[in-house]
Amino acid sequence: CRSMTMIRCSVAAVRARQFRFIGFSLHTFINIFFLLPLKAYALCTLSNSDWLSRGSAAKATGKGGKLDAIQDPVAASSPRESQENEAPLRRHNLARDATRSMAYDGICTDQ
């Protein structure tokens, strides 16, 4: 049935001298041989973690714009090497000191 439709569209395109009728015939081939396999591949690799995202691409870009290897602290050869690669963590004391009180405008005042 589809082959007859494709033949009819090709004949109509030649008779009318408008090649937009061939687009219908080509749409079938494009859909079956290109779009469907591409969709299947995308679904199969949906859980793949190798896809780059904006966050990992920004981290991997070096000064010269080239991609550098991302150093994984878990994959380091020794614990000391992984500690050298990590940035120091700053701990903020979020609890207020009992000797200070907050003024009405948000400025700390000593009592």
Swiss-Prot record:
Its EC number is 2.4.1.-. Transmembrane segments: none annotated. Keywords: Cell membrane, Glycosyltransferase, Membrane, Nodulation, Plasmid, Transferase. Residues 56-98 are annotated as: Disordered. Its main location: membrane. GO terms for cellular component: plasma membrane. Residues 81-98 have a biased composition (Basic and acidic residues). It is an enzyme of class 2 (transferase). It is a peripheral membrane protein. One of its GO terms (molecular function) is glycosyltransferase activity. Coiled coil: none annotated. The keyword Glycosyltransferase applies. Involved in the synthesis of Nod factor, a sulfated N-acyl-beta-1,4-tetrasaccharide of N-acetylglucosamine which initiates a series of events in the host plant species leading eventually to nodulation. This is N-acetylglucosaminyltransferase.
